[in-house]
Amino acid sequence: GLTRVDILSMKIDKRVIQSGNSIGGAISQDGRLVAVSNYEPGGVKIFDAATLELVADIPAVYGNDRQLSKVIGLVDAPGQKFIFSLWDAGEIWVADLSSPAKPVIRKFKDIGLNPYDALITPDGRYYIAGLFGEDGMALLDLWNLDDGVKRILNNYGKGEQKLPVYKMPHLEGWAIAGNLAFVPAIGRHEVLVIDTTTWTEAGRIKVHGQPVFVMARPDGRNIWVNFAVPDNDTLQVIDTQSLKIVKTLTPGKGVLHMEFEPRGEEVWTSVRDEDRLAVFDTETFEQVTTIEAKKPSGIFLTFRAHRTGL
């Protein structure tokens, strides 16, 4: 379902059932459209933000036998666009919703096996999809779509044995800090560092476990990382100048998500298995407070409304 919540009254304002299993959402540049990506039946549906009425339905149909693909990595982009990836098809689609009832779709095929998540850079220029089915990532320059998709980090991990993946990692625009991008390495206890001026590997950082979220503090000074089971009681902080771990924290069992205050002075973390939130000072790394909550998962502050791709 797609649910709209009035955050002032803390009540559900409206809800519509729109698919069998949905995975992500995004809001258009002008705030008038809400897009939802679906595993089942596969595709993206666009709704009017004011009424939650269906505006456009974009089935993720691919191949000669017209199968439906799971859709992941949905983000908003400048120019009333939504970008998303097709897990089963190995494609990236760019949907222009300038005329909402008649979306214009541009498809990029053969980007790699099983894109599992994606990010858009804060300036809205680059869309990067991580690949689960093979090493490397797929890069699309949204300012120069005719150049097509470029493969980056193709040789990372060649010939190496991956560990079992216990939790699918996530890519988000907050993994960008200055001219560097920090991304989780699938099936490895590493964070990859990418030079965004050349889109080549700039380093690898050994970490405590398999990274799930790799998030930059708003000023880009450090990177906070959480991990999949069995290491999901731990957070590590990476200095973006030295590329070294400067702090390891153990907030508790089931650290699932992090969210920074808009200026980065604090980071909120969900500690699901201990039914609480833990808030840390990002300079001293001291715990500021805890808040009781029943099985908290994602944490989303309202400043996201002013950020592309979040």
List each language-model region with its residue ranges.
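Predominantly soluble domains enriched in secretory-pathway, periplasmic, or organellar proteins
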Residues: 1-310
